[in-house]
Structures are given as C-alpha cells and as structure tokens.
C-alpha cells in the first residue's frame, strides 16, 4: 500500500495534502541541516525555470533568434547549437549572441539564490548537464562544479588536434559587439592556436568533445571524502529518462547507507524502489519549491 510523506520518506508530493507537504519539507530541511555535504544534480529543468529553454520555439527564442529562425529554419536554441553552419562567421554569430544574452548579461535569479542559501556553509559539489555556466556566475566555486557535457565558457579545437580548452566568454562578447546581420567579421573568428583550424564551443556528447578529466577527478574525490557519511543528494529538474545524472545519482544513494535522495521536478517524480525508504520527491516548480525548502531550513 502506498503511503504519504508523513508515514515514510518516499513521496509524490502532488498526491499529498498541503499539511503533509509542509511536514515533508520540515523532514527534508532536517536532513539538510544534519548533512555532512550536499551533492547537487541539475539538468534542463533548472535552466527552464531560469528562462532558458533549449527545446522551445517560444517568445524568448523569437526575440533573440527570429532572424536565424527564418533564414535557417531553426526551431529552437538546441537546433542552432547542433547546426551545420554554412560558414564560421554565421556559426559564431549564433554562439556569440547566445552567450552574450544568457551568460554575459546574466544576473543571479531568485531560484539560484535560494539554492545557495539552502547549501549555506556546507561542503557541496555540483554535477550538471547545463552548459550556460550559471552555477559559476552565481558564485558557486568552479572547482566544485562538474559540467559533464561541457560549457559555453570554453572552446576547443574542432578536430580536435590537441586537448587544451580555452576561455570563450570574452571572445563571445567581442564577437557579439561586432556582429552584423547574422555574421561576425572573418578576422575575429576563433582559430585553433595549434593547427589554425576552426574552433568549437566545448560542449556536446560526441567523441570530439574533450572530457574534463580534472573536474571528474575532483568529483570522485568528493565522493571518496563523504563515503559513509551523511550525504544529501539534491536533484533539480531531471526527468526519469536521464542516464547521465539521475541514474548514477540513484545508484550512488543505493550504495551509500547514510545518503538521502531529494528530487524536485515539475510533473514527474521517479524514484527506484530500492531507495524509496530514504528518498523524497516533490512535484512542482523549482521557483516555488526551493523558497519553501529554504524557509524550512532557516526555521
């Protein structure tokens, strides 16, 4: 028989009454306060909450990329990120505009400020498939962030002829300022300092993306440090099909006797049966759930 959060940790919060949800938040807050460390997993649900929707042909996409949409038939930001561009001048015009808008002009949002407040002074680590770099821009320590699919702040040789990654934010800002009619000047197009070939933003899941071995090593060291200790795994905006973050996180919780799993997502809560006794699931908008959790943690 299924039970509510007042009876056992596992909960699909949309099936619970308000009083039970409030009690659930208090239980979760207690877990945060008692935790030795917090492991944050984040995917596109967090980006969407902040106003960045890679998959949507929405008003924001029309405002930023309406000209690209009509010229190239792009249906969303992700299609532009994966496009085979006719020229490097056009490719970098797209990326410069994207990075300038979502990174160069970015200001920390309430959802990220609430997340920082929940973490407080505890040790933490962030594992994310989001490439826009908002964790770092909001003041999270970049040495405690593992962006498993790369990020927009760095670029690499497109071949690649070597495994060095280079900063791209300042370059993108210069390109954005120089862009005219969907093109950037040829002389400003980034070139590989080794082979002279084209450069790509350091992101993606194919074999050409240079892996961030240093960040991966730091993540493994974090897990080693808190093995057997009270670790809260906080998952933000990740659907059940996610094999890059969600599946490994649940396996980690299953292997750690003192770990607690907290998943926040809109419209879909998935927790495997083998960890449900030490898991919490809250169904709702992150910009509503995180302030409520922050309030519970500070009570």
Located regions from the model:
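Conserved catalytic alpha/beta core of Sir2/sirtuin-type deacylases, generalized to analogous enzyme cores
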Residues: 1-299
């Amino acid at each position: 028989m299924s039970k509510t959060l007042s009876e056992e940790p596992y909960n699909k919060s949309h099936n619970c009454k308000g009083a039970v949800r409030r009690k659930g938040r208090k239980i979760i807050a207690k877990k945060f306060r008692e935790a030795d460390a917090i492991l944050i997993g984040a995917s596109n649900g967090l980006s969407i909450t902040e106003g960045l929707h890679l998959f949507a042909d929405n008003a924001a996409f029309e405002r930023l990329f309406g000209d690209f949409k009509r010229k190239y038939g792009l249906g969303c930001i992700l299609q532009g990120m994966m496009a085979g561009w006719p020229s490097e001048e056009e490719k970098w015009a797209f990326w410069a505009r994207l990075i300038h808008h979502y990174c160069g002009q970015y200001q920390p949002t309430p959802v990220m400020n609430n997340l920082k407040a929940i973490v407080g002074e505890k040790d933490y680590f962030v594992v994310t498939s989001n490439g826009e770099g908002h964790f770092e821009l909001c003041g999270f320590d970049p040495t405690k962030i593992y962006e498993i699919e790369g990020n927009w702040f760095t670029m690499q040789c497109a071949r690649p002829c070597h495994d060095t990654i280079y900063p791209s934010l300042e370059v993108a800002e210069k390109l954005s300022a120089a862009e005219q009619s969907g093109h950037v000047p040829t002389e400003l197009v980034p070139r590989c300092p080794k082979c002279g070939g084209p450069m790509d933003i350091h992101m993606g899941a194919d074999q050409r993306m240079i892996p961030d071995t240093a960040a991966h090593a730091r993540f493994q060291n974090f897990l080693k440090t808190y093995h057997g200790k009270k670790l809260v795994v906080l998952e933000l905006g990740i659907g059940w099909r996610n094999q890059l973050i969600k599946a490994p996180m649940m396996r980690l919780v299953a292997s750690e006797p003192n770990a607690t799993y907290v998943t926040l997502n809109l419209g879909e809560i998935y927790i495997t049966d083998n960890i449900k006794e030490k898991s919490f699931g809250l169904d709702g908008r992150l910009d509503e759930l995180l302030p409520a959790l922050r309030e519970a943690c500070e009570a």
